Amino acid sequence: GQHHDASTGAVMPPVYQTSTFVQTSPGQPLNPDYEYSRAANPTRTALENALASIENGTRGLAFSSGLAATDCVLRSFKAGDEIIAMDDLYGGTYRMFTRIYKDSGIKFQFVDINDLETFQSLINENTKLVWVETPTNPLMKLADIAAIAQITKANNILFAVDNTFAT
């Protein structure tokens, strides 16, 4: 949840519009959590804590772009792992999968995710993630999140849903 500010009583955190924070000497920040806003700042920390609370998680992560978040997820996998993805994805995501991660040893398989029979036939012991975008950009295809979640849960596979276009 959201905690109030003890010094002001404010129930909403302020937006910190600073890039740097006080240092007692070079490389020695006054508060070890905050040295430079690109790494961390109190506003982003408040957002991440709120997201974790809403999702009943232990930690939330906020990124400056969807592709940065996608890259973070993909770095959880190793050579030999397989990822099943929708056949219609945002171009940047598709290029990340097929070009940037081309030499990673991670195998990407693209499928009409609403053809559940074909989708299930691609699942094997190396399948670690199913990646869905719904609605898709630009074709506005929709995916049956509930049905896919049931399949991934039954197979102990992670399931990621990018709903950027909906938001």
Region spans (language model):
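A general structural signal for well-ordered alpha-helical segments in protein cores
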Residues: 14, 44-48, 145
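Conserved N-terminal alpha-helix of the aminotransferase class I/II PLP-enzyme fold
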Residues: 20-71, 76, 92-101
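Active-site donor-binding loop signature of nucleotide-sugar glycosyltransferases
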Residues: 1, 19, 113
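Conserved PLP-enzyme active-site core in the AAT-like
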Residues: 61-167
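Short conserved active-site loop signatures built around small residues
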Residues: 1-11, 15
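Residues at alpha-helix termini
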Residues: 8, 54-55, 104, 155
